[in-house]
Amino acid sequence: MLDATEWGIVALSLKVGGVAMAVTLPIAFALAWLLARVRFPGKVVVDAAIHLPLVVPPVVTGWLLLLAFGPNGPIGDWLQDWFGVTVLFRWTGAAIAAGVMALPLMVRAMRISIEAVDRRLENAARTLGAGPWRVFWTLTLPLSIPGVLAGAVLGFARSIGEFGATITFVSNVPGETQTLPLAIYSALQQPGADALVWRLSCVSVGLSLIALIASELLTRRAGRGLHVL
């Protein structure tokens, strides 16, 4: 059984992952739709930039976030001057780091789902008088929803497992930024904390497994729905 402190770590991880997913979802969908449906110069470069967090060391991503959101960074300075807000050493900063790391996976899953929608259906709707927004809301979005949700769940799984960018950007503050991966890392540094490592690791694996199964089921549902059409 987990004690109160350990349950707090789990709750913080779920909060960080949930906020990261919710904030990143509309951004990821917009980027996925842009890459799937719009032709523009430099599309390959934009696609590569979106997927950079997948290949760049997470520490580098965390450092770049620190430069951007730090007290002397352009975004951090703006947040402090206008809203009196700082994300350094805060759980909100951990959510930002998790969202950035999850973004490429979400965009990729959503883009595949949008591209799977037959353009002939969209063209047929337009010939019947439907405008671009109506085609999007009544056809493209409903058909791609299962894939979009699958990408969101996959992003959530990635968010709750984020370590490198988080510890670099917002450090490892118990009760504030110490999510499950960071708590496991801290426990590994403590002699005789093997039981704690096991408990937290089992919770982490369990949450990730549930999220991955949900993502797979949604992906299959999306495939069946499009196959029927």
Descriptions of predicted regions:
Residues 19-50, 63-65, 113-115, 120-121, ...:
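Transmembrane-helix boundary motif in ABC transporter permease subunits
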Residues 1-4, 62-99, 169-173:
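Membrane-interfacial helix termini and adjacent extracytoplasmic/periplasmic loops
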Residues 42, 108-122, 126-130, 194-229:
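C-terminal transmembrane helix and the adjacent membrane-cytosol boundary/short C-terminal tail
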Residues 70-71, 148-186:
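Non-cytoplasmic
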Residues 17, 21-29, 33, 59, ...:
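Hydrophobic positions within alpha-helical transmembrane segments of bacterial inner-membrane proteins
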